Amino acid sequence: MTPNGYLIFEDESFLDSTVAKMNALRKSGQFCDVRLLVCGHELMAHKAVLACCSPYLFEIFNADTEPQGGVSLVKFDDLNPDAMEVLLNYAYTAQLKADKSLVSDVYSAAKKLKLERVKQICGEYLLSKMDSQSAISYRNFASSMADGRLLGKIDGYIQDHLHEISEQDDFLKLPRLKLEVMLEDNLNLPGNGKLYSKVISWVQRSLWKNGDPLEKLMEEVQTLYYSADHKLHDGSLLEGQAEVCSTEDDHIQFVQKKPPRERDEMGSGASGSISPSNSQFNKHEWKYIASEKTTSNSYLCLAVLRGLLCVISLHGRTSPHNSPSATPCVLKSPNFEAQLEDLQEKLLKPMHYARSGLGTAELDCKLIAAGGYNREECLRTVECYDPKKDCWTFIAPMRTPRARFQMAVLMGEVYVMGGSNGHSDELSCGEMYNPRADEWIQVPELRTNRCNAGVCSLQNKLFVVGGSDPCGQKGLKNCDSFDPVTKMWTSCAPLNIKRHQAAVCELSGYMYVIGGAESWNCLNSVERYNPENNTWTLVASMNVARRGAGVAVYEGKLFVVGGFDGSHALRCVEVYDPATNEWRMLGSMTSARSNAGLAVLNNVLCAVGGFDGNEFLNSMEVYNLEKNEWSPFIEALGKN
């Protein structure tokens, strides 16, 4: 007896005994109210048990208001019956037992049923069994499952073991794009990923603008030209045609439109066949994975081209022709090229995906980079950078693909609001990331769709300010605050000037809204919000009008980097001192970056991603306050 007069007894064996009996009832078909038909095989179960385990089945059962004969029927035509039986046993006993040959099928079934914990355990098991012989097949599987976290770990393994992997049958059977790169005198191919980014840009241009199928590009050796100013040109430039390049607006169109021709790219033959399984993969993925030097001027690269895992063979040879560039340029010596390769090893680790219009924030001494868009798609993947290990890892992806949004940390959790999903749809929905559970949770929607809005945490509330109208052409004055306790949105005083793509940040209890654009005209004006009296005040204007800039508080001041001035992506940086109400210019970044992310990580200012006017970036660089300079090297990260 307890002092309050209640009897309290806990039977430690009851739970195990009960679930064992329930599982026995399931196997004998007793009291079952759901029939699972898996590829013609019938499995009986109890809806209450399955609904507690599987969000997918919960939604189905919740919508099934009139089951025939009191028994619901759910059909699965794409799952392994044995794998489903494994998951049913898990649902009843909390024990996962699967033969090693069945793990990938269990993973697929867990993904379908939204059993995230089981999916994660199966993924970790597969990784533990991966070797150079199985790496390619594992990568194909992870791609077919669209598992960004698993892909990231497999790609990391491939980068470390490419030489051994390249000797395996699975690698040798991959489709192959053969390139001959013409070089100016005294030039060598650079041994870094930038060359392959340019190659991927060329492939995309051929597929999108010329309508050539990928299979056709792989039929013959393709000729490209690498000039002394480190630009890659189409081989037809030798006959005077245009350079391989494009603008950010072109890239944004790629995000919103489907290709002019969608084909099932099927070939035959061991040397370059495109397998049926590959054709089912995500056709929107473009990625450089790894490369190795095979001879003095030849490289082997593993990449993903429009969702297809393939090999790119590059061989460089001196061009008998003159440079197609109209601008004279200084030739770099082979020694200089070798120095570039040495420096490449010391560069800060790039993100797995190039991203522009992404959300970034510092959380628990790590850098979070979420969503954004690249040349092909709007992303939902999220990466986390650990400065101690200099590595990016995937965390749980967002529920919705989104770009052109901002991110803020409030009460130890990450919030994202609005943006665009890449299909010309402005978003009103938002999400919150719980780092303890590694999951994204939906939050109450905004009252209106908001793309290119600023997001900021201030006085334990989340503020969303400005943004673009539904047509995406005019800025808004709207300002709204969200209370995470009451889950309610409240309208605040509007801005003085309509703005979209403004940089927004909190400093000393005030919210600053910096630059942006009213329609297409970029702004240099800055407004400051006082939450105590709900008023906006104009403060000193920036030196450079810009939209899509990054902003962060560093050493008690506002640092604004990059952006777009209406004509060019910017490298320039300026800082605002609230004590003097003045802006001054600082050292420029090493790369122009529009719509990049900016955050302070371990007292170091870090810029990541963005668009440089020609390419989407996955690189990072950091600022040295004492030297007033930016650097992309690991050494600079530790010396700030």
From Swiss-Prot:
InterPro entries, per database record: BACK (IPR011705), BTB-kelch_protein (IPR017096), BTB/POZ_dom (IPR000210), Kelch-typ_b-propeller (IPR015915), Kelch_1 (IPR006652), SKP1/BTB/POZ_sf (IPR011333)
Kelch repeat ranges per the UniProt record: 366-412, 413-460, 462-509, 510-556, 557-603, 605-640
Disulfide bonds: none
Keyword Ribonucleoprotein appears in the UniProt entry: no
Chain residue ranges for the region called Disordered: 257-278
Sequence ranges assigned to domain BTB in this UniProt record: 32-100
GO CC annotations, alphabetized: Cul3-RING ubiquitin ligase complex; cytoplasm; cytoskeleton; nucleus
Signal peptide (from-to): none
GO annotation, biological process: proteasome-mediated ubiquitin-dependent protein catabolic process
Subcellular location: Cytoplasm; Cytoplasm, Cytoskeleton; Nucleus
Domain BACK: 135-186
UniProt keywords, alphabetically: Cytoplasm, Cytoskeleton, Kelch repeat, Nucleus, Repeat
Low complexity bias (residue ranges): 267-278
Designated name of the protein: Influenza virus NS1A-binding protein homolog B
Source species: Danio rerio
Lineage: Eukaryota, Metazoa, Chordata, Craniata, Vertebrata
